[in-house]
Design a protein with these regions (language model features):
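A short, aliphatic-rich alpha-helical micro-motif
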Residues: 1, 71, 297-301
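Conserved small/polar residues in nucleotide/adenosyl-binding loops
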Residues: 3-11, 390-395
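Metallo-beta-lactamase
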Residues: 9-10, 103-151, 206-209
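Conserved beta-strand hairpin/beta-sheet module of binuclear metal-dependent hydrolase folds
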Residues: 10-65, 153-156, 160-164, 264
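Active-site metal-binding motif and surrounding structural segment of the metallo-beta-lactamase
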Residues: 45, 56-103
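Active-site neighborhood of phospho(di)ester-bond hydrolases with catalytic His/Asp-centered motifs
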Residues: 50-52, 75-82, 103-105, 162-165, ...
Length: 398
């Protein structure tokens, strides 16, 4: 039916919703293409719902669930993740299906009580526990800190589906199709990197542990809580999460700068031109006062080279630069090649603070930082051209 599409034409239904209203995810990250909150229903001898949706969409969601159940009751709700964009409708669901058993781990249940006051009708699972629903056998694997402590993933042994919570998720609504084979997925890949860098970025090690755990499973379909159901591109989604969580940047440079009156920006332009002259094609520039930090983080996770420029502002870094750097620092981004530059009018502080940032991140610093006093002089312009010859392995060395 139009209300709920059967993911497999065999008992697994998509009952998620699109959010085309919200401007900022987590009230921070822009959503130009919206976002989906995905929920899945297994209609077997027993009925199992996996995760719910944001409470704002509970009416649409509950109708989809009721339509797919077609008069049957709901036996189990599996809670892979307690974040309110997925757990927000649990209380209303329980009101509608008072006998539903809520499946989770002990960390889930602490949050369930805290957010929803629910303490009854709980079905606790531990690592490797199973739930048989008739044709389907579900196995539960803990995935702590991907990206909350209670997170677990549910593997359907029968259909080889992993219900992966936020892992392998992406921004972007589902515009018609639900499965990747029914749509053009091109625009989701950049959005997946942006989603990863914004939401999951800090938790590279836990993601690696979760990937290790899942590597022994035959995964043919990934049902994440955000974005398309991955079937044709399941291995590509896993590969992106693998590369991101190892902080493995691709060839390229992101130049991040702040500039009040354009002097630091001129330095950034000169450095970019020099990089291009030296054969670097992937160069992205971000004016911190204009680019949302969401997109800056995406490029920092994507590319191996990071160059930061800042004017001095009251003996500190330019505040907007400082704000972006604190978000990068929070995510503990590793393995970057770092260059920096700055400007000042009477007392320079930006360059030494950028140097300290590079050290704190344990990044490899290259080149000679240029510090410009007042307007960009011819000498300093030449220094900008020479300062950051980002050394990529040339074909003959490779």
């Amino acid at each position: 039916s139009s209300a709920a599409s059967d993911v497999y034409k065999r008992q697994v239904y998509y009952v998620g919703v699109n959010d085309r209203q919200k401007a900022l995810f987590e009230n921070m990250w822009p959503l130009p293409y919206g976002v989906s909150y995905n929920s899945y229903l297994i209609v077997d001898e027993k009925t199992v719902l996996i995760d719910t949706v944001d409470v704002c969409y509970s009416d649409i969601f509950l109708k989809k669930v009721a339509d797919a159940l077609d008069g049957r009751s709901l036996d189990y709700l599996v809670v892979n993740h307690m974040e309110p964009d997925h757990a927000g409708s649990i209380r209303l669901l329980r009101q509608q299906y008072p006998d539903v058993q809520i499946v989770g781990n002990n960390k889930t249940f602490g949050m369930l009580e805290g957010y929803h006051g629910i303490k009854e009708g709980l079905f606790e699972v531990k690592e490797g526990d199973t739930l048989n629903t008739g044709r389907h056998e579900l196995v539960f694997y803990m995935a702590p800190m991907v990206h909350w402590p209670e997170v677990m993933v549910t593997y359907d042994v029968t259909d080889k589906i992993v219900f992966s919570a936020d892992a392998f998720g992406t921004y972007g609504t589902l515009d018609g199709g639900v499965i990747d084979t029914e749509m053009n997925v091109e625009h989701y890949w950049e959005e997946m990197i942006r989603y990863y860098s914004n939401i999951v970025g800090k938790y590279g090690s836990p993601v690696q542990r979760a990937l290790q755990k899942l590597s022994g499973l035959d995964i043919q379909t990934i049902c994440s809580t955000h974005g398309p159901v991955w079937r044709e591109y399941a291995s590509k989604a896993i590969d992106i999460y693998d590369r991101m969580s190892r902080y493995e940047g691709e060839e390229g440079v992101v130049i991040i700068y702040g500039s009040m009156y354009g002097n630091t920006e001129q330095m950034a332009e000169a450095i970019a031109a020099s990089l291009a002259d030296n054969g670097i094609k992937n160069i992205v520039m971000h004016n911190v006062s204009k680019s949302p930090s969401s997109y800056i983080l995406k490029d920092v996770f994507k590319y191996k080279g990071v160059i930061v420029g800042s004017p001095t502002y009251s003996n500190q870094l330019f505040p907007e630069v400082e704000a972006v750097l604190s978000k990068i620092e929070l995510r503990e981004v590793k393995n970057r090649i770092f260059g920096y530059f700055g400007s000042f009018t009477w007392a320079g502080a930006a360059v030494k603070r950028l140097a300290a940032f590079g050290e704190k991140m344990k990044w490899e610093t290259v080149g000679t930082p240029v510090e410009q006093k007042q307007g960009l002089s011819a000498t300093k312009y030449e220094e900008c051209l020479a300062c950051l010859l980002y050394t990529s392995p040339s074909p003959r060395d490779a």
